[in-house]
A protein has these predicted regions:
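Aromatic-anchored transmembrane helix interface
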Residues: 2-4, 18-41, 52, 57, ...
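Alpha-helical transmembrane segments of multi-pass inner-membrane proteins
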Residues: 9-10, 45-76, 86-154, 162-163, ...
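Membrane-interface helix caps and helix-loop-helix hairpins in membrane proteins
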Residues: 13-23, 130-132, 312-318
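Membrane-interface micro-motifs in multi-pass membrane enzymes
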Residues: 23-26, 83-98, 135-137, 260-263, ...
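Active-site-proximal inter-transmembrane loops
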Residues: 72-89, 123, 248-262, 267
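Hydrophobic transmembrane alpha-helices and their immediate junctions
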Residues: 146-150, 156-161, 269-306
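A membrane-periplasm/extracellular boundary helix in multi-pass inner-membrane enzymes
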Residues: 152-198, 213-221, 229, 238
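Long extracytoplasmic/lumenal interhelical loops at the membrane interface
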Residues: 198-217, 221, 225-271
């Protein structure tokens, strides 16, 4: 991660707006907590960290349900999308990770009373995941659920069938019981349909697809080292014009900047193949961490799957609520 930050600082040298580029890199400050955790966190405290995280999520979920049932209000938050303390994409991803932590708590906790408590919390969290409008976390959750069988089952075929069945059951239940999830999923299907049939890239998902295609095309002009931070628009404009996308759809703090709503596209444009390789190495090295405790190793892999999927729909390294 620190090699990535150093390389980003070097990339400021070939960025046209160096003040903006430095401000952009400065937002990676939240990673400074990593060496503190690495040097200070003892193994016996890890479970307490997870418990504290779950407590924080419980508070968020109670607040979310209160907004949904209109027991209380929060400025700028609609009952139709009750994500109380962060945007729904990040909140839904946190909820997805919460559900998996609770799943392991239920399996490995011996105390029957705690099993019941965790089971109720599990249902509480799963319902909340599909009540809010964050499709990112919802689909990341379903993908991770299908892959999790490989972590614990020797019979891989049986595991895949079991977890795909479970994922399908959760999806069908959410579609029929959650108006928010049903509306957003129907809108997603409509968006894809008009994108394919009418070449209309003006809606939520199709706009992202247009940005991804434009970014990949733009990256070819500075493939090795990238165009620099804040200069993403330089080679993407003519592609965006083909999709009839106006500048209002991606206004940023500097004239030449674009948020491609995909971390991998963003960094291959900004930092080239070199930057993208560094990003992928971060995931690989985290995956290869020598964690002997099976539960923590599985949770790490689940976390990486969720984070990888989340990053496909947003620049997750560059937000203060980054996981």
């Amino acid at each position: 991660i620190f090699i990535f930050i150093i390389y980003s600082l070097i990339a400021v040298l070939w960025s046209s707006d160096k003040i903006f580029a430095l401000e952009y890199v400065k937002k990676y400050y939240h990673f400074l907590i990593i060496p503190i955790i690495f040097t200070s966190l003892k193994k016996e405290y890890i479970d307490k960290v997870f418990s504290t995280f779950l407590l924080g999520m419980l508070i968020s979920e109670i607040t979310s349900y209160g907004i949904f049932f209109e027991l209380w209000t929060k400025e700028g938050i609609s009952p139709n999308d009750p994500s109380p303390f962060m945007d729904h994409s990040n909140y839904s991803t946190y909820l997805a990770f919460t559900v998996f932590i609770l799943m392991y708590k239920i399996i490995y906790t011996d105390d029957f009373k705690w099993k019941i408590a965790y089971s109720i919390f599990f249902l509480f969290s799963t319902s909340n995941l599909f009540l809010n409008g964050g499709r990112t976390g919802q689909f990341s959750f379903l993908i991770a659920l299908c892959l999790i069988g490989f972590l614990n089952f020797k019979n891989k075929l049986k595991a895949v069938v079991l977890f795909i069945s479970l994922g399908t059951t959760i999806f069908v239940s959410a579609y029929n019981l959650s108006p928010v999830f049903k509306d957003r999923f129907d809108y997603f299907l409509h968006d894809v349909e008009v994108m394919i049939n009418e070449k209309d890239f003006s809606n939520s998902f199709s706009l992202r697809v247009a940005l991804w295609i434009s970014g990949l095309e733009a990256s070819k002009h500075n493939l090795i080292f990238g165009s620099g931070i804040g200069d993403e628009r330089e080679n993407a404009n003519y592609i965006l014009q083909k999709f009839n996308i106006s500048n209002d759809n991606f206004k940023q703090e500097t004239e030449n900047s674009i948020d491609f709503h995909n971390m991998y596209v963003q960094y291959i444009v900004q930092l080239g193949i070199v930057g993208l390789i560094i990003i992928l190495l971060i995931f690989y090295l985290l995956f290869k961490l020598d964690i002997r405790d099976k539960v923590y190793k599985n949770l790490l892999i689940i976390f990486l799957i969720l984070y990888f999927c989340h990053s496909m729909l947003g620049n997750s390294f560059h937000i203060n609520q980054s996981m």
